[in-house]
Amino acid sequence: VRCIAAVRADTDIVQGYKIGRGDPWHRKVIGRVYHHVVKLLFRLRVRDTDCDFRLIRRTLLEKVSLRSNTGVICVEMMCSFQRAGARFVQVGVSHYARPHGKSQFFRLPAIWRSGVQLLQLWWRLMVRRDIGPANP
């Protein structure tokens, strides 16, 4: 409801960020480190790139072309939107612990793979400045 209430005529994307994160301490630490690294490497002004609560104007989606097909797509998307001049509004969203199961991400091989993918994305977007062509 907060995301919908934040939509205005001058807003291209309403981006959520987690509040009251209901995770174990080690996930909070890893998540915080990840977000600081992402903000530093990609110069992002978004508070939480991986919060999946977002409303995006179709016209903004039509301006960018995303190529990632892994977990770094959220970083590519936010970086591409920011470069396209998108106007962001950020809204806090409640975050709850998983009632069942475990995340597959918080294992060393997955963390390593994500780190490598993040560096590859950094090289493509920040060094080569290759954000891809706009969609036709």
Predicted regions and their residues:
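C-terminal, non-catalytic tails of nucleotide-sugar-dependent glycosyltransferases
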Residues: 117-136
